[in-house]
């Protein structure tokens, strides 16, 4: 069985730039400041399912 992955979507433009492995121990959604190549800036990315 493979690892289920979830996307990290940019809050500015909405593009899904990063994918991370899902962790069952984490109940809240992940939020990270990452670089968005579409916006050209560092922006907050939120976990989508």
Curated annotation (Swiss-Prot):
Any one GO cellular component localisation term in the record: ribosome
GO MF annotation list: structural constituent of ribosome
UniProt keyword Lyase, yes or no: no
UniProt keywords, alphabetically: Ribonucleoprotein, Ribosomal protein
InterPro entries (UniProt xref): Ribosomal_bL33, Ribosomal_bL33_sf, Ribosomal_zn-bd
Pfam families: Ribosomal_L33
GO biological process: translation
Family the UniProt entry places it in: Belongs to the bacterial ribosomal protein bL33 family.
Protein known as: Large ribosomal subunit protein bL33B
Taxonomic source organism: Latilactobacillus sakei subsp. sakei (strain 23K)
Taxonomic lineage: Bacteria, Bacillati, Bacillota, Bacilli, Lactobacillales
Gene: rpmG2
